[in-house]
A protein has these predicted regions:
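Small/polar/charged residue-enriched interaction surfaces, especially the RNA/DNA-contacting tracks
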Residues: 1-163
Length: 163
């Protein structure tokens, strides 16, 4: 029996980036004033996800969040044919036909379990940024994976926080 997989690393990366975005927003670090802080130097990301950087006051640290892989059972799949368009002529390139198999899991409940050490969420802005990033996935605002312009990777759900 085949199953589709949503790897924890993919979800973790997307949530880390979105957490950095919301932390910058809450702390008024906007890109136009050159104070926006990238994910690898962002307080929220450092507190929750850790870093491999070793520069100045930033030291390597392990992440304080554990994400689970999600396996999707009983999925329907569609095979989508694609062609490659020649950018000079606008025509189809010879030998550039390929197919993509897409899993669909409409109306199927998926559970992504995330464990975070309490100390990582002590700062109010860090906690709010992380929770808002998670809520963005539940609201369908943060798609995961490729092909999102075709509607792939859109999730709608609920956020259940347990202390």
């Amino acid at each position: 029996e085949s199953k589709s997989l949503i790897p924890a690393t993919s979800v973790k990366g997307a949530i880390s980036h979105r957490t950095a975005y919301h932390w910058n927003r809450f702390t008024k670090h906007f890109v136009d004033n050159a104070e926006a802080i990238a994910s690898d130097r962002n307080k929220a990301c450092l507190d929750i996800f850790g870093t491999t950087l070793d520069e100045g006051d930033i030291k390597p640290s392990r992440g304080k969040a554990i994400f689970s892989d999600v396996f999707i059972e009983n999925t329907d799949s569609k095979v989508l044919p694609h062609i490659r368009v020649d950018k000079f002529t606008g025509g189809v390139m010879d030998g550039a036909l390929f197919q993509e198999k897409v899993s669909t899991a409409e109306n199927q409940e998926l559970v992504e379990e995330i464990w975070v050490e309490k100390e990582a969420l002590q700062d109010e802005d860090v906690r709010k940024a992380f929770e808002k990033a998670l809520q963005d996935i539940c609201d369908g605002l943060l798609p995961l994976g490729g092909g999102t312009n075709r509607g792939n990777g859109i999730f709608i759900g609920t956020l259940n926080i347990q202390e």
